[in-house]
A protein has these predicted regions:
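Residues within the DNA-recognition helix of helix-turn-helix
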Residues: 25, 160-163, 167
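C-terminal edge and immediately downstream basic/flexible tail or linker adjoining helix-turn-helix-like DNA-binding
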Residues: 9, 90-91, 148-149, 165-183
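Arg/Lys-rich amphipathic alpha helix in sigma70-family domain 2
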Residues: 59-62, 73-93, 111
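A short pre-motif secondary-structure segment
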Residues: 132-136
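Acidic, proline/glycine-rich intrinsically disordered inter-domain spacer in sigma factors
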Residues: 90-91, 98-123
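Structural recognition of an alpha-helix C-terminal capping motif at a helix-to-coil junction
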Residues: 31, 45-52, 65-77
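Short, charged helix-capping/linker segments at alpha-helix termini
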Residues: 11-20, 30-49, 154, 177-178, ...
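Sigma70-family region 2
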Residues: 11-12, 49-66, 85-87
Length: 183
């Protein structure tokens, strides 16, 4: 079944079309949610909310641009809304609790870190830093757009991005030392 047929079926509230949309895109969209969530259950909650929005707003998809891109945008906006609703309940753990070595100021080898390492380190950022970092680096938004989406000043977006990068660099250096690789 084509995307257009699935869209038309979902607009008519056809359960089979809704299931096909879920089956075809839930894995991809869960990956998007994982970048903004602190753990998998939270990402799954975001995904559920995103699909509710998708189903309720599917009639607004104009057909211009990629359908997958529209789904991604709805999902990212859902993650932002989820972040705002749950901001006071967020906590993060810190790799510094597990690392006693002093940090050098060198870079790192990308191939040295597993996807799990990178995911864990990203999730150790505060929710605000992680949100700005992901919107800027992964989604490609400009700081002005991020500021408008999150209701913050442009300079706040820039400084949070800069601080997130510095924190990530330090945490990755610490992780390398923990693994016994001195750069």
């Amino acid at each position: 079944m084509s995307d257009q047929n699935i869209i038309e079926g979902c607009i008519r509230h056809n359960r089979k079309a809704q299931q096909m949309l879920w089956k075809q895109y839930s894995g991809y969209l869960l990956g998007v949610c994982m970048r903004y969530a602190t753990d998998r259950p939270e990402a799954e909650d975001m995904l559920q909310e995103a699909f509710l929005r998708i189903f309720f707003n599917l009639g607004e998809y104009s057909g211009t641009g990629s359908f997958k891109g529209w789904l991604r945008k709805v999902t990212v906006n859902t993650a932002i809304t989820y972040y705002h609703k749950n901001l006071r309940h967020k906590h993060h753990t810190d790799i510094d609790d597990y690392v006693n070595a002093e940090t050098g100021s060198s870079g790192f080898e990308e191939d040295f870190y597993s996807a799990e390492d990178l995911y864990r380190v990203l999730n150790e950022l505060s929710p605000g830093y992680r949100m700005v970092f992901n919107l800027y680096t992964t989604e490609g938004y400009k700081h002005q757009e991020i500021a408008e989406m999150l209701g913050i000043d442009v300079n706040t977006s820039k400084s949070q991005y800069s601080r997130a990068r510095a924190i990530l660099r330090k945490k990755l250096d610490d992780l390398a030392k923990l693994k016994g690789v001195y750069t």
